[in-house]
Amino acid sequence: MASSHSSGTFTDAGPDDAATRRNGKRTLGDVQGTLLGLAHYLFNFVRGEAASRPALREQATELLRVRMWGIEADEPHRKALAAGDLILVFLGAPERKFIGQAELASAVHDWTPFEAQVYPGDSRGGVLLAEVEEWDPPVPMSTVLSQIDPAENARADFEAGIVRVTANEYETALAVAAARQPRAM
């Protein structure tokens, strides 16, 4: 469900299947365009087939709160995801809004029996999340795109549930989110 499909790309920062790893960890320079060996991804969440399920944002928020994200076997970048990678959580069309960010606490794995009981979806495996931050208000993709150089060819729609993004795209989304947060008095 979390990896259903929409259409287009934000800017897929390129393939990472050639990334070399040492001792199970990504090393500096493994993947072009990464910051200190970390990769940046957009997790694209779109409406599942069942109309009786809760609204899109509530479904995605539930995954963030349990700190788990289901990843299907055919998902692009599945094998490249590693603990420490950074993600943006995006609600696909028609919402087209970022609702948070997180750090991956694990690589993709089959759920343990305990994780399978806790996970609110139907995926057989996925990643664990750490440093989860929900964004309220959510950040419209159009606002982020307006801050990115048009030469980067960033777009708002995606065919894949996981899209590799550049460090600049990731940092731009964080900056826009920070500027939108209510200020404490």
Whereabouts are the PLM-identified features?
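Compositionally biased, charged N-terminal/linker segments
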Residues: 3, 10, 14-16, 20-83, ...
